[in-house]
Protein backbone atom coordinates (compact mmCIF):
# COMPACT_ATOMS: atom_id res chain seq x y z
CA UNK A 1 0.00 0.00 0.00
CA UNK A 2 2.79 2.46 0.92
CA UNK A 3 4.56 1.69 -2.33
CA UNK A 4 1.38 2.40 -4.33
CA UNK A 5 0.83 5.71 -2.55
CA UNK A 6 4.45 6.76 -3.20
CA UNK A 7 3.98 5.99 -6.89
CA UNK A 8 0.80 8.05 -6.98
CA UNK A 9 2.51 10.97 -5.26
CA UNK A 10 5.34 10.88 -7.79
CA UNK A 11 2.82 10.95 -10.62
CA UNK A 12 1.02 13.86 -8.99
CA UNK A 13 4.26 15.79 -8.70
CA UNK A 14 4.90 15.10 -12.36
CA UNK A 15 1.45 16.43 -13.25
CA UNK A 16 0.37 13.11 -14.74
CA UNK A 17 -2.73 12.55 -12.64
CA UNK A 18 -6.06 14.27 -12.84
CA UNK A 19 -7.58 16.41 -10.15
CA UNK A 20 -9.98 13.53 -9.49
CA UNK A 21 -7.14 11.23 -8.46
CA UNK A 22 -5.54 14.01 -6.42
CA UNK A 23 -8.79 14.30 -4.53
CA UNK A 24 -8.78 10.56 -3.94
CA UNK A 25 -5.28 10.78 -2.43
CA UNK A 26 -6.36 13.61 -0.17
CA UNK A 27 -9.27 11.52 0.97
CA UNK A 28 -7.05 8.54 1.72
CA UNK A 29 -4.83 10.72 3.91
CA UNK A 30 -7.90 12.53 5.32
CA UNK A 31 -6.39 15.85 4.20
CA UNK A 32 -8.39 18.82 2.97
CA UNK A 33 -7.80 20.31 -0.45
CA UNK A 34 -7.21 24.08 -0.62
CA UNK A 35 -7.39 25.26 -4.23
CA UNK A 36 -5.65 28.54 -4.90
CA UNK A 37 -7.14 28.81 -8.38
CA UNK A 38 -10.89 29.13 -8.80
CA UNK A 39 -12.74 30.14 -11.98
CA UNK A 40 -15.57 31.88 -10.13
CA UNK A 41 -14.79 35.55 -9.54
CA UNK A 42 -17.05 38.49 -8.82
CA UNK A 43 -18.12 40.15 -12.09
CA UNK A 44 -20.61 42.65 -10.74
CA UNK A 45 -22.79 43.50 -7.76
CA UNK A 46 -26.49 44.33 -7.70
CA UNK A 47 -27.31 46.94 -5.07
CA UNK A 48 -30.93 46.66 -4.03
CA UNK A 49 -31.08 50.04 -2.30
CA UNK A 50 -30.20 51.83 -5.56
CA UNK A 51 -31.74 49.20 -7.87
CA UNK A 52 -28.56 49.19 -9.95
CA UNK A 53 -25.62 46.99 -10.92
CA UNK A 54 -21.98 47.99 -10.85
CA UNK A 55 -19.08 46.23 -12.53
CA UNK A 56 -16.67 44.87 -9.94
CA UNK A 57 -13.09 46.08 -10.26
CA UNK A 58 -12.01 45.19 -6.75
CA UNK A 59 -9.28 42.62 -6.23
CA UNK A 60 -10.61 39.66 -4.28
CA UNK A 61 -8.70 36.48 -3.54
CA UNK A 62 -10.73 33.37 -4.31
CA UNK A 63 -10.13 29.97 -2.75
CA UNK A 64 -12.01 26.70 -2.65
CA UNK A 65 -11.65 24.56 0.45
CA UNK A 66 -12.73 20.93 -0.02
CA UNK A 67 -13.47 18.98 3.14
CA UNK A 68 -13.30 15.23 2.79
CA UNK A 69 -14.08 14.23 6.37
CA UNK A 70 -14.93 15.74 9.73
CA UNK A 71 -11.46 15.48 11.28
CA UNK A 72 -10.26 18.79 12.72
CA UNK A 73 -6.63 17.76 12.13
CA UNK A 74 -7.23 17.63 8.39
CA UNK A 75 -7.69 21.41 8.24
CA UNK A 76 -4.80 23.09 6.36
CA UNK A 77 -4.37 25.43 9.32
CA UNK A 78 -1.01 26.91 8.32
CA UNK A 79 -2.18 27.72 4.80
CA UNK A 80 -5.34 29.37 6.09
CA UNK A 81 -3.36 31.47 8.56
CA UNK A 82 -1.09 32.71 5.78
CA UNK A 83 -4.09 33.60 3.64
CA UNK A 84 -5.94 35.62 6.24
CA UNK A 85 -2.82 37.66 7.02
CA UNK A 86 -3.13 39.26 3.58
CA UNK A 87 -4.82 42.63 3.19
CA UNK A 88 -7.01 41.78 0.22
CA UNK A 89 -10.57 40.48 0.79
CA UNK A 90 -10.90 36.70 0.61
CA UNK A 91 -13.78 34.72 -0.84
CA UNK A 92 -13.82 31.15 0.55
CA UNK A 93 -15.87 28.55 -1.29
CA UNK A 94 -16.31 25.81 1.31
CA UNK A 95 -17.34 22.44 -0.13
CA UNK A 96 -18.09 19.69 2.37
CA UNK A 97 -17.83 16.72 0.07
CA UNK A 98 -18.02 13.73 2.33
CA UNK A 99 -19.93 12.38 5.24
CA UNK A 100 -16.88 10.30 6.16
CA UNK A 101 -16.80 10.49 9.93
CA UNK A 102 -13.90 9.58 12.15
CA UNK A 103 -14.81 6.59 14.37
CA UNK A 104 -18.40 6.71 13.14
CA UNK A 105 -20.47 5.27 10.35
CA UNK A 106 -20.60 7.37 7.22
CA UNK A 107 -23.82 9.25 6.46
CA UNK A 108 -25.03 11.67 3.77
CA UNK A 109 -23.13 14.92 4.12
CA UNK A 110 -26.10 17.20 4.84
CA UNK A 111 -27.35 14.83 7.53
CA UNK A 112 -23.87 14.78 9.03
CA UNK A 113 -23.82 18.58 9.16
CA UNK A 114 -27.27 18.79 10.76
CA UNK A 115 -26.44 16.23 13.45
CA UNK A 116 -23.32 18.18 14.43
CA UNK A 117 -20.70 15.73 13.20
CA UNK A 118 -18.74 18.58 11.60
CA UNK A 119 -19.16 21.04 14.47
CA UNK A 120 -15.69 20.66 15.97
CA UNK A 121 -14.06 21.21 12.61
CA UNK A 122 -16.36 24.08 11.69
CA UNK A 123 -15.70 25.84 14.99
CA UNK A 124 -11.94 25.46 14.56
CA UNK A 125 -12.19 26.90 11.05
CA UNK A 126 -14.33 29.83 12.14
CA UNK A 127 -11.98 30.63 15.01
CA UNK A 128 -9.18 30.87 12.47
CA UNK A 129 -11.21 33.22 10.29
CA UNK A 130 -12.05 35.39 13.28
CA UNK A 131 -8.37 36.35 13.53
CA UNK A 132 -8.40 37.88 10.06
CA UNK A 133 -8.07 41.65 9.67
CA UNK A 134 -9.52 41.65 6.17
CA UNK A 135 -13.03 41.01 4.86
CA UNK A 136 -13.89 37.33 4.59
CA UNK A 137 -16.72 36.01 2.43
CA UNK A 138 -17.86 32.43 3.02
CA UNK A 139 -19.98 30.46 0.55
CA UNK A 140 -20.83 26.92 1.67
CA UNK A 141 -22.13 24.02 -0.46
CA UNK A 142 -23.22 26.13 -3.41
CA UNK A 143 -25.28 25.31 -6.54
CA UNK A 144 -27.56 23.18 -4.43
CA UNK A 145 -30.62 23.60 -6.67
CA UNK A 146 -29.23 22.21 -9.94
CA UNK A 147 -31.51 19.23 -10.70
CA UNK A 148 -29.47 17.25 -13.22
CA UNK A 149 -25.91 18.32 -12.67
CA UNK A 150 -25.22 15.88 -9.81
CA UNK A 151 -21.66 17.04 -9.29
CA UNK A 152 -21.97 17.59 -5.56
CA UNK A 153 -23.32 15.31 -2.80
CA UNK A 154 -25.48 18.14 -1.39
CA UNK A 155 -27.50 18.40 -4.61
CA UNK A 156 -30.86 16.67 -5.03
CA UNK A 157 -31.19 16.25 -1.27
CA UNK A 158 -34.35 18.28 -0.80
CA UNK A 159 -34.77 21.94 0.03
CA UNK A 160 -35.74 21.45 3.67
CA UNK A 161 -32.65 19.42 4.57
CA UNK A 162 -30.39 21.84 2.74
CA UNK A 163 -31.92 24.83 4.54
CA UNK A 164 -31.47 23.21 7.96
CA UNK A 165 -27.84 22.36 7.19
CA UNK A 166 -27.10 25.87 5.89
CA UNK A 167 -28.62 27.46 8.97
CA UNK A 168 -26.56 25.18 11.19
CA UNK A 169 -23.31 26.30 9.55
CA UNK A 170 -24.40 29.95 9.48
CA UNK A 171 -25.23 30.04 13.20
CA UNK A 172 -21.85 28.56 14.11
CA UNK A 173 -20.12 31.08 11.86
CA UNK A 174 -21.97 34.02 13.39
CA UNK A 175 -21.08 32.81 16.87
CA UNK A 176 -17.36 32.16 16.37
CA UNK A 177 -16.55 34.55 13.52
CA UNK A 178 -19.27 37.22 13.47
CA UNK A 179 -17.49 39.51 11.01
CA UNK A 180 -17.51 36.92 8.20
CA UNK A 181 -19.95 37.69 5.38
CA UNK A 182 -22.12 34.63 4.78
CA UNK A 183 -22.91 34.06 1.10
CA UNK A 184 -25.88 32.00 -0.04
CA UNK A 185 -24.76 30.60 -3.36
CA UNK A 186 -27.36 29.09 -5.67
CA UNK A 187 -26.52 28.84 -9.33
CA UNK A 188 -29.59 30.97 -10.03
CA UNK A 189 -31.36 28.13 -11.81
CA UNK A 190 -35.21 27.98 -11.83
CA UNK A 191 -36.36 26.93 -8.38
CA UNK A 192 -33.50 28.60 -6.50
CA UNK A 193 -35.99 30.30 -4.19
CA UNK A 194 -36.97 26.94 -2.69
CA UNK A 195 -33.56 26.75 -1.01
CA UNK A 196 -33.58 30.22 0.55
CA UNK A 197 -32.49 29.72 4.20
CA UNK A 198 -33.89 32.98 5.57
CA UNK A 199 -32.93 36.62 5.87
CA UNK A 200 -31.16 36.34 9.22
CA UNK A 201 -28.78 33.61 8.02
CA UNK A 202 -27.48 35.36 4.89
CA UNK A 203 -25.50 38.54 4.20
CA UNK A 204 -25.04 38.25 0.43
CA UNK A 205 -26.55 36.25 -2.43
CA UNK A 206 -24.49 35.02 -5.36
CA UNK A 207 -25.41 33.49 -8.72
CA UNK A 208 -23.23 31.82 -11.34
CA UNK A 209 -23.01 33.03 -14.92
CA UNK A 210 -22.27 29.64 -16.42
CA UNK A 211 -23.66 28.77 -19.84
CA UNK A 212 -22.22 25.24 -19.90
CA UNK A 213 -24.10 24.00 -16.83
CA UNK A 214 -27.33 25.79 -17.69
CA UNK A 215 -27.53 24.35 -21.20
CA UNK A 216 -26.90 20.86 -19.85
CA UNK A 217 -29.82 21.26 -17.45
CA UNK A 218 -32.19 22.66 -20.10
CA UNK A 219 -33.28 25.68 -18.04
CA UNK A 220 -36.78 27.03 -18.26
CA UNK A 221 -37.28 29.76 -19.30
CA UNK A 222 -34.48 29.21 -21.81
CA UNK A 223 -31.66 31.69 -22.31
CA UNK A 224 -30.89 33.26 -25.66
CA UNK A 225 -27.75 35.05 -24.44
CA UNK A 226 -25.50 35.66 -21.46
CA UNK A 227 -27.32 38.96 -20.91
CA UNK A 228 -30.65 37.15 -20.78
CA UNK A 229 -29.26 34.58 -18.36
CA UNK A 230 -27.98 37.33 -16.06
CA UNK A 231 -31.33 39.12 -16.12
CA UNK A 232 -33.37 36.05 -15.22
CA UNK A 233 -31.00 34.96 -12.48
CA UNK A 234 -31.28 38.38 -10.89
CA UNK A 235 -35.06 38.24 -11.28
CA UNK A 236 -35.15 35.04 -9.21
CA UNK A 237 -33.39 36.86 -6.38
CA UNK A 238 -35.97 39.65 -6.13
CA UNK A 239 -37.61 38.25 -3.00
CA UNK A 240 -34.44 38.44 -0.93
CA UNK A 241 -33.40 41.81 0.45
CA UNK A 242 -29.69 41.18 -0.09
CA UNK A 243 -27.03 42.34 -2.54
CA UNK A 244 -26.43 39.91 -5.40
CA UNK A 245 -22.93 39.00 -6.60
CA UNK A 246 -22.57 37.73 -10.17
CA UNK A 247 -19.81 35.10 -10.36
CA UNK A 248 -17.83 34.12 -13.43
CA UNK A 249 -17.21 30.55 -14.58
CA UNK A 250 -15.05 28.54 -16.94
CA UNK A 251 -17.55 29.20 -19.74
CA UNK A 252 -18.11 32.91 -18.95
CA UNK A 253 -14.84 34.34 -17.68
CA UNK A 254 -14.13 37.78 -16.33
CA UNK A 255 -12.22 38.55 -19.51
CA UNK A 256 -15.13 37.57 -21.77
CA UNK A 257 -17.83 39.26 -19.71
CA UNK A 258 -18.76 42.67 -21.09
CA UNK A 259 -19.60 45.73 -19.02
CA UNK A 260 -22.17 46.56 -21.68
CA UNK A 261 -24.29 43.61 -20.57
CA UNK A 262 -24.61 45.05 -17.08
CA UNK A 263 -25.40 48.48 -18.49
CA UNK A 264 -28.22 47.01 -20.58
CA UNK A 265 -29.51 45.14 -17.55
CA UNK A 266 -29.46 48.37 -15.56
CA UNK A 267 -31.74 49.95 -18.15
CA UNK A 268 -34.19 47.06 -17.83
CA UNK A 269 -34.12 47.34 -14.05
CA UNK A 270 -35.11 50.99 -14.29
CA UNK A 271 -37.87 50.28 -16.82
CA UNK A 272 -39.37 47.46 -14.74
CA UNK A 273 -38.57 48.75 -11.27
CA UNK A 274 -42.05 48.01 -9.94
CA UNK A 275 -41.50 44.33 -10.74
CA UNK A 276 -37.83 43.80 -9.88
CA UNK A 277 -37.98 45.84 -6.70
CA UNK A 278 -41.27 46.48 -4.97
CA UNK A 279 -42.15 47.50 -1.45
CA UNK A 280 -45.04 45.06 -1.48
CA UNK A 281 -42.78 42.03 -1.87
CA UNK A 282 -42.37 40.40 1.58
CA UNK A 283 -38.57 40.45 1.71
CA UNK A 284 -38.48 38.99 5.20
CA UNK A 285 -40.48 35.93 4.18
CA UNK A 286 -39.14 32.73 5.61
CA UNK A 287 -41.01 29.44 5.82
CA UNK A 288 -44.36 30.56 7.21
CA UNK A 289 -45.20 33.62 5.12
CA UNK A 290 -48.46 32.35 3.63
CA UNK A 291 -51.38 33.99 5.41
CA UNK A 292 -53.77 31.95 7.53
CA UNK A 293 -57.40 32.47 6.57
CA UNK A 294 -59.47 29.74 8.25
CA UNK A 295 -61.41 32.21 10.35
CA UNK A 296 -64.27 31.49 7.97
CA UNK A 297 -65.81 28.27 6.74
CA UNK A 298 -63.90 26.13 4.29
CA UNK A 299 -65.19 26.48 0.72
CA UNK A 300 -65.97 23.05 -0.74
CA UNK A 301 -66.45 22.80 -4.46
CA UNK A 302 -66.31 20.79 -7.66
CA UNK A 303 -65.63 21.07 -11.34
CA UNK A 304 -68.54 18.88 -12.37
CA UNK A 305 -69.72 19.40 -15.98
CA UNK A 306 -71.85 16.23 -15.85
CA UNK A 307 -73.63 17.58 -12.73
CA UNK A 308 -73.07 14.41 -10.68
CA UNK A 309 -72.05 16.07 -7.40
CA UNK A 310 -73.28 19.66 -7.44
CA UNK A 311 -76.40 18.99 -5.36
CA UNK A 312 -74.53 17.64 -2.36
CA UNK A 313 -75.38 19.83 0.66
CA UNK A 314 -71.81 20.75 1.66
CA UNK A 315 -70.89 22.22 -1.73
CA UNK A 316 -70.59 26.01 -1.69
CA UNK A 317 -68.69 26.69 -4.91
CA UNK A 318 -68.42 25.47 -8.52
CA UNK A 319 -65.58 25.77 -11.01
CA UNK A 320 -66.03 26.98 -14.60
CA UNK A 321 -63.28 26.86 -17.24
CA UNK A 322 -63.86 29.32 -20.06
CA UNK A 323 -62.04 31.21 -22.79
CA UNK A 324 -62.37 34.46 -24.72
CA UNK A 325 -64.51 32.93 -27.45
CA UNK A 326 -67.03 31.64 -24.90
CA UNK A 327 -67.23 35.10 -23.35
CA UNK A 328 -67.88 36.63 -26.76
CA UNK A 329 -70.56 34.16 -27.93
CA UNK A 330 -72.49 34.04 -24.65
CA UNK A 331 -71.69 30.44 -23.66
CA UNK A 332 -69.86 31.57 -20.53
CA UNK A 333 -72.75 33.76 -19.39
CA UNK A 334 -75.12 30.80 -19.68
CA UNK A 335 -72.81 28.55 -17.62
CA UNK A 336 -72.17 31.27 -15.06
CA UNK A 337 -75.84 32.10 -14.53
CA UNK A 338 -76.63 28.42 -13.98
CA UNK A 339 -74.19 28.34 -11.06
CA UNK A 340 -75.54 31.61 -9.65
CA UNK A 341 -79.07 30.19 -9.81
CA UNK A 342 -77.85 27.33 -7.59
CA UNK A 343 -76.71 29.95 -5.03
CA UNK A 344 -73.09 28.82 -5.25
CA UNK A 345 -69.93 30.91 -5.35
CA UNK A 346 -67.90 30.54 -8.55
CA UNK A 347 -64.30 29.91 -9.54
CA UNK A 348 -63.89 31.31 -13.05
CA UNK A 349 -60.72 30.16 -14.79
CA UNK A 350 -60.38 32.36 -17.84
CA UNK A 351 -58.04 30.91 -20.45
CA UNK A 352 -56.88 33.83 -22.63
CA UNK A 353 -57.30 32.27 -26.04
CA UNK A 354 -60.18 31.98 -28.47
CA UNK A 355 -59.91 28.46 -29.83
CA UNK A 356 -57.71 25.95 -28.09
CA UNK A 357 -57.43 23.71 -31.12
CA UNK A 358 -56.92 26.13 -34.02
CA UNK A 359 -56.00 29.67 -33.06
CA UNK A 360 -52.95 29.91 -30.79
CA UNK A 361 -51.96 33.50 -30.16
CA UNK A 362 -48.26 33.29 -29.28
CA UNK A 363 -48.29 37.01 -28.50
CA UNK A 364 -51.16 36.66 -26.02
CA UNK A 365 -49.31 38.34 -23.16
CA UNK A 366 -48.10 41.33 -25.13
CA UNK A 367 -51.47 41.73 -26.84
CA UNK A 368 -53.16 41.79 -23.44
CA UNK A 369 -51.00 44.69 -22.29
CA UNK A 370 -51.60 46.49 -25.59
CA UNK A 371 -55.35 46.37 -24.97
CA UNK A 372 -56.24 44.06 -27.85
CA UNK A 373 -58.75 42.14 -25.73
CA UNK A 374 -60.19 45.00 -23.70
CA UNK A 375 -63.73 44.55 -25.06
CA UNK A 376 -63.69 40.91 -23.98
CA UNK A 377 -62.39 41.72 -20.50
CA UNK A 378 -64.98 44.47 -20.14
CA UNK A 379 -67.79 42.06 -21.04
CA UNK A 380 -66.43 39.42 -18.64
CA UNK A 381 -66.13 41.78 -15.69
CA UNK A 382 -69.59 43.20 -16.34
CA UNK A 383 -71.16 39.73 -16.23
CA UNK A 384 -69.51 38.63 -12.97
CA UNK A 385 -69.68 41.88 -10.98
CA UNK A 386 -72.16 43.17 -8.41
CA UNK A 387 -73.86 39.91 -7.49
CA UNK A 388 -74.32 38.37 -4.00
CA UNK A 389 -71.96 35.47 -4.68
CA UNK A 390 -68.17 35.65 -4.49
CA UNK A 391 -66.36 35.13 -7.79
CA UNK A 392 -62.77 33.83 -7.67
CA UNK A 393 -61.30 35.03 -10.96
CA UNK A 394 -58.29 33.01 -12.15
CA UNK A 395 -56.45 34.17 -15.29
CA UNK A 396 -53.75 32.41 -17.34
CA UNK A 397 -53.20 29.45 -15.00
CA UNK A 398 -50.29 26.96 -14.87
CA UNK A 399 -48.03 29.46 -16.59
CA UNK A 400 -44.83 27.95 -15.19
CA UNK A 401 -45.12 24.46 -16.70
CA UNK A 402 -42.62 24.17 -19.60
CA UNK A 403 -45.01 22.60 -22.12
CA UNK A 404 -46.98 23.86 -25.13
CA UNK A 405 -50.48 23.20 -23.80
CA UNK A 406 -51.27 26.91 -23.47
CA UNK A 407 -49.78 29.84 -25.42
CA UNK A 408 -49.07 31.73 -22.17
CA UNK A 409 -46.75 28.93 -21.03
CA UNK A 410 -43.01 28.93 -21.77
CA UNK A 411 -43.05 32.72 -21.72
CA UNK A 412 -40.83 35.25 -20.00
CA UNK A 413 -42.04 35.74 -16.40
CA UNK A 414 -41.80 39.54 -16.64
CA UNK A 415 -44.09 39.51 -19.68
CA UNK A 416 -46.56 37.28 -17.86
CA UNK A 417 -46.55 39.49 -14.77
CA UNK A 418 -47.25 42.62 -16.81
CA UNK A 419 -50.18 40.93 -18.55
CA UNK A 420 -51.58 39.51 -15.31
CA UNK A 421 -51.40 42.89 -13.59
CA UNK A 422 -53.13 44.52 -16.55
CA UNK A 423 -56.00 42.03 -16.38
CA UNK A 424 -56.26 42.06 -12.58
CA UNK A 425 -56.54 45.85 -12.42
CA UNK A 426 -58.73 46.22 -15.50
CA UNK A 427 -61.88 46.51 -13.42
CA UNK A 428 -62.79 45.43 -9.91
CA UNK A 429 -65.97 44.82 -7.95
CA UNK A 430 -66.27 43.97 -4.27
CA UNK A 431 -67.53 40.45 -4.98
CA UNK A 432 -64.50 39.55 -7.17
CA UNK A 433 -61.37 37.96 -5.71
CA UNK A 434 -58.34 37.78 -8.00
CA UNK A 435 -56.63 34.38 -8.03
CA UNK A 436 -53.09 33.74 -9.23
CA UNK A 437 -53.01 30.16 -10.43
CA UNK A 438 -49.66 28.41 -10.86
CA UNK A 439 -49.56 24.64 -10.86
CA UNK A 440 -47.16 24.95 -7.93
CA UNK A 441 -44.30 23.35 -9.84
CA UNK A 442 -40.60 24.13 -9.58
CA UNK A 443 -39.83 27.82 -10.03
CA UNK A 444 -43.49 28.88 -9.98
CA UNK A 445 -42.87 31.88 -7.73
CA UNK A 446 -40.94 33.54 -10.58
CA UNK A 447 -44.34 34.40 -12.06
CA UNK A 448 -45.64 35.99 -8.84
CA UNK A 449 -47.31 39.27 -9.91
CA UNK A 450 -47.39 40.98 -6.50
CA UNK A 451 -49.71 40.85 -3.52
CA UNK A 452 -51.35 44.17 -4.40
CA UNK A 453 -53.12 42.44 -7.33
CA UNK A 454 -53.69 38.97 -5.83
CA UNK A 455 -56.22 37.87 -3.21
CA UNK A 456 -55.61 34.12 -3.34
CA UNK A 457 -53.02 31.70 -4.69
CA UNK A 458 -54.40 28.56 -6.29
CA UNK A 459 -52.62 25.28 -6.86
CA UNK A 460 -53.53 22.01 -8.54
CA UNK A 461 -52.92 18.64 -6.87
CA UNK A 462 -53.21 15.48 -8.93
CA UNK A 463 -51.95 12.09 -7.86
CA UNK A 464 -50.10 11.24 -11.06
CA UNK A 465 -46.76 13.08 -11.03
CA UNK A 466 -46.31 13.03 -14.82
CA UNK A 467 -47.70 11.61 -18.03
CA UNK A 468 -45.20 8.73 -18.11
CA UNK A 469 -46.85 7.05 -15.12
CA UNK A 470 -50.20 5.30 -15.55
CA UNK A 471 -50.10 2.90 -12.60
CA UNK A 472 -52.41 4.37 -9.97
CA UNK A 473 -50.37 2.68 -7.22
CA UNK A 474 -47.45 4.94 -8.12
CA UNK A 475 -49.40 8.12 -7.45
CA UNK A 476 -48.04 10.54 -4.89
CA UNK A 477 -50.03 11.29 -1.79
CA UNK A 478 -51.98 14.53 -1.48
CA UNK A 479 -49.86 15.44 1.55
CA UNK A 480 -46.48 15.08 -0.13
CA UNK A 481 -47.58 17.06 -3.20
CA UNK A 482 -49.18 19.81 -1.14
CA UNK A 483 -46.22 20.24 1.19
CA UNK A 484 -43.82 20.66 -1.73
CA UNK A 485 -46.03 23.22 -3.44
CA UNK A 486 -46.79 25.04 -0.19
CA UNK A 487 -43.06 25.46 0.41
CA UNK A 488 -42.43 26.72 -3.12
CA UNK A 489 -45.08 29.41 -2.73
CA UNK A 490 -44.01 30.73 0.69
CA UNK A 491 -42.99 34.08 -0.81
CA UNK A 492 -46.46 34.70 -2.23
CA UNK A 493 -47.89 35.73 1.15
CA UNK A 494 -51.46 34.98 0.19
CA UNK A 495 -53.88 32.24 1.36
CA UNK A 496 -54.26 29.08 -0.69
CA UNK A 497 -57.22 27.87 -2.71
CA UNK A 498 -56.82 24.35 -4.10
CA UNK A 499 -58.88 24.98 -7.22
CA UNK A 500 -58.14 21.60 -8.79
CA UNK A 501 -57.35 18.21 -7.31
CA UNK A 502 -58.02 14.63 -8.29
CA UNK A 503 -56.92 11.02 -8.05
CA UNK A 504 -57.02 8.06 -10.42
CA UNK A 505 -57.77 4.41 -9.66
CA UNK A 506 -60.39 2.12 -8.11
CA UNK A 507 -62.88 3.77 -5.78
CA UNK A 508 -61.38 2.25 -2.61
CA UNK A 509 -57.96 3.61 -3.57
CA UNK A 510 -59.45 7.03 -4.28
CA UNK A 511 -61.11 7.06 -0.84
CA UNK A 512 -57.81 6.22 0.84
CA UNK A 513 -56.07 9.03 -1.06
CA UNK A 514 -58.86 11.48 -0.20
CA UNK A 515 -58.70 10.57 3.48
CA UNK A 516 -55.07 11.66 3.48
CA UNK A 517 -56.13 14.83 1.66
CA UNK A 518 -58.74 15.65 4.31
CA UNK A 519 -56.21 15.23 7.12
CA UNK A 520 -53.83 17.67 5.45
CA UNK A 521 -56.53 20.20 4.61
CA UNK A 522 -57.61 20.18 8.25
CA UNK A 523 -54.04 20.86 9.41
CA UNK A 524 -53.47 23.95 7.28
CA UNK A 525 -55.57 27.04 8.12
CA UNK A 526 -53.86 28.71 5.15
CA UNK A 527 -56.22 26.76 2.87
CA UNK A 528 -59.34 28.78 2.06
CA UNK A 529 -61.06 26.18 -0.09
CA UNK A 530 -60.82 23.00 -2.15
CA UNK A 531 -62.41 22.09 -5.46
CA UNK A 532 -62.46 18.52 -6.80
CA UNK A 533 -62.01 17.94 -10.55
CA UNK A 534 -64.82 15.44 -11.20
CA UNK A 535 -64.09 14.72 -14.84
CA UNK A 536 -61.49 13.26 -17.18
CA UNK A 537 -58.57 15.48 -18.08
CA UNK A 538 -58.41 17.25 -21.43
CA UNK A 539 -57.91 14.76 -24.30
CA UNK A 540 -54.36 14.73 -25.73
CA UNK A 541 -53.10 16.92 -22.86
CA UNK A 542 -51.13 13.88 -21.68
CA UNK A 543 -49.56 13.24 -25.07
CA UNK A 544 -49.72 9.61 -26.13
CA UNK A 545 -50.47 8.44 -22.60
CA UNK A 546 -53.96 7.44 -21.53
CA UNK A 547 -55.96 10.46 -20.40
CA UNK A 548 -56.63 10.04 -16.65
CA UNK A 549 -60.20 10.16 -15.39
CA UNK A 550 -60.40 11.81 -11.97
CA UNK A 551 -64.14 11.21 -11.50
CA UNK A 552 -65.44 9.85 -8.19
CA UNK A 553 -68.83 8.59 -7.05
CA UNK A 554 -71.22 10.74 -5.01
CA UNK A 555 -70.70 8.39 -2.05
CA UNK A 556 -66.91 8.81 -2.17
CA UNK A 557 -67.22 12.58 -2.34
CA UNK A 558 -69.71 12.63 0.53
CA UNK A 559 -67.39 10.47 2.64
CA UNK A 560 -64.49 12.80 1.86
CA UNK A 561 -66.33 16.00 2.80
CA UNK A 562 -67.53 14.43 6.05
CA UNK A 563 -63.87 14.23 7.14
CA UNK A 564 -63.26 17.97 6.76
CA UNK A 565 -63.30 20.53 9.54
CA UNK A 566 -64.78 24.04 9.38
CA UNK A 567 -67.66 22.83 7.26
CA UNK A 568 -70.13 25.30 5.76
CA UNK A 569 -72.81 25.63 8.43
CA UNK A 570 -75.69 26.87 6.33
CA UNK A 571 -75.44 24.17 3.67
CA UNK A 572 -74.75 21.42 6.18
CA UNK A 573 -77.92 22.06 8.13
Locate predicted features:
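Alpha-helical scaffolding within the catalytic cores
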Residues: 44-51, 72-81, 122-125, 186-200, ...
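Glycoside hydrolase catalytic-domain groove-lining segments
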Residues: 78-95, 195, 200, 210-254, ...
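Aromatic-lined carbohydrate-recognition surfaces of secreted/lumenal glycan-active proteins
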Residues: 141, 166-193, 241-254, 420-445, ...
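Substrate-binding cleft of secreted/luminal carbohydrate-active enzymes
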Residues: 41, 241-305, 390-397, 497-573
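Hydrophobic membrane-insertion alpha-helices, especially the h-region
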Residues: 5-19
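Substrate-binding cleft of extracellular glycoside hydrolase catalytic domains
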Residues: 73-180, 334-433
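N-terminal substrate-binding region of glycoside hydrolase catalytic domains
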Residues: 25-120, 206, 251, 277-280, ...
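Structural preference for beta-strand elements that scaffold enzyme active sites
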Residues: 42, 59-62, 87-91, 135-139, ...
Amino acid sequence: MRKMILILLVLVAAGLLTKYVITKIHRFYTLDDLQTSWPQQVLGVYNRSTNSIIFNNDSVLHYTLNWVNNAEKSLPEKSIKLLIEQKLPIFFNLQIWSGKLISKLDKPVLNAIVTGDFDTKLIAFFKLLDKSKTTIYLRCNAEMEMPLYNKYPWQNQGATLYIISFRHVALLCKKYSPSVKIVWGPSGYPGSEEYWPGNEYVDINSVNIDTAKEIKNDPYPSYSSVEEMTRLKLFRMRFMNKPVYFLSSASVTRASFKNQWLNELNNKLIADKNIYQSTIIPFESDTTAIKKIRDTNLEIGVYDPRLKLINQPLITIEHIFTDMKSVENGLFKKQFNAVIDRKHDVIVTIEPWKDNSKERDSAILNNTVLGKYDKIWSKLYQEISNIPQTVYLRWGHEMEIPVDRYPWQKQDPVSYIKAFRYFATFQKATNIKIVWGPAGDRGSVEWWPGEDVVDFVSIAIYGLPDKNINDYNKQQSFTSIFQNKFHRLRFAHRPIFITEFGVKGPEDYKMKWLKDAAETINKYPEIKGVCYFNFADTPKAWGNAETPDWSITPLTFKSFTALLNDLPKTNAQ
